[in-house]
Amino acid sequence: MKNYKKNLKILEDGHVYSKEMEHDACGVGLIASTEGKKSRKVVEYGINALKAVWHRGAVDADGKTGDGAGIHLEIPSDFFAEKIEITGHDHDGSEICVGMIFLPRNNYQAQENARTLVESELTKSNFSIYGWRQVPVNPKVLGEKANLTRPEITQVLFKHNNKDLTEKELERKIYESRRKIEKEAIKDAIEGFYICSLSSKSVIYKGMFLAESIADFYLDLKDERFISRFAIFHQRFSTNTAPSWDLAQPFRALAHNGEINTFKGNTNWMKVHEQEMNSPLFDNMENLKPVIQPGSSDSAALDSVFELLNISGQSAPLAKLMLIPDAWSKKSQTLSKDHQQLFNFLNSTMEPWDGPAAIAATDNEWAIVAADRNGLRPMRYTISKDKILCAGSETGMVEIDEKQILKKGRLGPGEILGVRI
């Protein structure tokens, strides 16, 4: 493990290994309130559901290092308002923005460079920094390999100085700032720096622990004030990859089980689309390029494009149809004319990202689960009388009395199940 990076470079230089060929077979799912109410139950269901799909991930020989697991939740304002006060600032009622960031644990100069970069770019974009918070963790639950590669896990708390911004405008400014930070970090060669999430709406907790240990490692998740309207969870199984903290999912917009067989073509086509990208919504389109970072896995690349579509104004259901379309034909006798015209338009806009896939995704207005056009990855769901949707790779991930179940089933090829949160 100590020589991991050195040996990995030897393999890459010899063209024996490439990150671009990485694929996963995982467990994925969504818990959501069908009436759009934040609750502790959604968070606890999400944690329990993640624990239930532990068998969809691999375990290292040390018995504690996993391939990666994580959960994506809304930002609980009461919880983080207290953390802001600890920094010596008063929360003035403005939107609380939170960045979940991995830093190189044993390189203090790189840590300082990364923090300076984050603060500098956010300040340039008219954000004010409340401060940094070291996320409380329990490394005792980690295996030896996970602990050796464990990053310094921190959160940056901040706000925008213009309170008149709409939620979407604020998210766009945060997104553009994050992209600038990422580009500068690559330029400055800051290794071990990774932004899990940077948002005014949600936060992602993930890592190389066992799924059952997520709340034991991230102590924040045990706080009763941690409430949410949705929980997207993911258990990674690396079929031909080396696990790492940054490759654990969920990513910023979605969690993905499957593989994109058209990945190389999709990546090349995105480079073409970048030449035509233009929008008055962003300060400078060059800040957003490249949309797909070099060396990204297929899941990470899909997430990058999905996120860009969301942040540009496309809803999560529409973004799914653009990237992972239904199987359809102009000769269909059952498909309505309106649907044919929609699919024809989307087909002319974006090439399909094809391959076996089940996803759980959110744009902070919609929370969805969906299947690929052939239905090659399972996605099952249960809707309970207490207005909770439980969807994922397995049925029975959360214990619900049969008498409390309104409906249950599975998604067919190309189908989407969504909740407007």
Give residue ranges: language-model regions:
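Conserved short alpha-helical segments that host acidic/polar catalytic motifs at enzyme active sites
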Residues: 2-421
